[in-house]
Swiss-Prot record:
It comes from Mycobacterium tuberculosis (strain ATCC 25618 / H37Rv). This is DegV domain-containing protein Rv2417c. Hexadecanoate binds at S89. Residues 3-274 form the DegV domain. SUPFAM superfamilies: DAK1/DegV-like. Keywords: Lipid-binding. The lineage of its organism: Bacteria, Bacillati, Actinomycetota, Actinomycetes, Mycobacteriales. May bind long-chain fatty acids, such as palmitate, and may play a role in lipid transport or fatty acid metabolism.
Length: 280
């Protein structure tokens, strides 16, 4: 048998990649009009980012069930679970408590990121598991990926950020932001302000510059995410392809309903695993 990798629906891994590398996921939740909607399971309105909804992490019951199934299917080889940043969701803490109940064969990794910042770490673990590596090695592969990953998001609207409460230090600048558009990064698991500029196109340009500076002439795995703006995401992917010839083209995916609620319509983000091979 082989080690089984589990993640959550913040990861934005396309279904074909999850299937290829046998990566399982548990749902995060959206609470809307008295309903508890499971990301990736229940039907969620396309315009959820416009609704007054809230988000919640994977439940202990869901995590325990997923880990126990994975542990059984691994034949005792173990489980590596890679989850959304502990600073952004209660999922990781619930996962830690669940793993402690199940014993040392379940290892939980804090991605300290979101979207494909989670996905790239899960992919690293999935590849190691597919190669037949033992539990410690698979866990180290995920942890090594965490140390290589950077994530940015250019935000077009401020309403969702004001409601979110997930942005470190946001109260200090949101009230005086006027029409300035923020570029955020994930720093040690927290969403923090990098820079404020006059237009979202300028914020996006700065984001592209930052990514290119990080990568240089090295290979890297790239992902571009968006909230209700695939054209903008495709433009970012094209710009990265032109400026980073050593990298395979970026995958482009929606940011997903949970993250969309926090950053709002028109947001475009980039996740990069510097030095990694592309997720093919």
């Amino acid at each position: 048998m082989t080690v089984v990798v589990v993640t959550d629906t913040s990861c934005r891994l396309p279904a074909d990649l999850r299937e290829q590398w046998s990566i399982r996921q548990v749902p995060l939740h959206i609470l809307l009009d008295g309903l508890d909607l499971r990301d990736g399971v229940d039907e969620i309105p396309d315009d959820i980012h416009k609704r007054h909804a809230t988000t919640a992490g994977a439940t202990p019951v869901e995590l325990s069930a997923a880990y126990q199934r994975a542990l059984a299917d691994s034949g005792g080889d173990g489980v590596v679970a890679v989850h959304i940043s502990s600073a952004l969701s209660g999922t990781f803490r619930a996962a830690e408590l669940t793993a402690a109940e199940l014993g040392p064969a379940v290892r939980v990794i804090d991605s300290r990121s979101a979207a494909m910042g989670v996905g790239f770490a899960a992919l690293a673990a999935g590849r190691a598991a597919a190669a037949g590596d033992e539990l410690d090695t698979v866990a180290r592969a995920a942890a090594a990926a965490v140390s290589r990953i950077h994530a940015f998001v250019a935000v077009a609207r401020l309403d969702n950020l004001r409601r979110s409460g997930r942005i470190s230090g946001a109260k200090a600048w949101l009230g005086t932001a006027l029409a300035l558009k923020p570029l955020l990064s994930v720093d040690d698991g927290k969403l923090v302000l990098v820079q404020r500029v006059r237009t979202v196109s300028n914020a996006t340009a700065v984001m592209i510059d930052r990514v290119c500076q990080l990568v240089g002439d090295r290979p890297a795995a790239l992902a571009v995410h968006h909230v209700a703006d695939p054209a903008a995401a495709n433009d970012v992917a094209a710009a990265l392809a032109e400026r980073l010839p050593a990298c395979e083209p970026a995958m482009v995916t929606a940011m997903g309903p949970v993250l969309a609620l926090h950053v709002g319509a028109g947001a475009v983000g980039v996740c990069v695993d510097v030095g990694a091979s592309p997720p093919a």
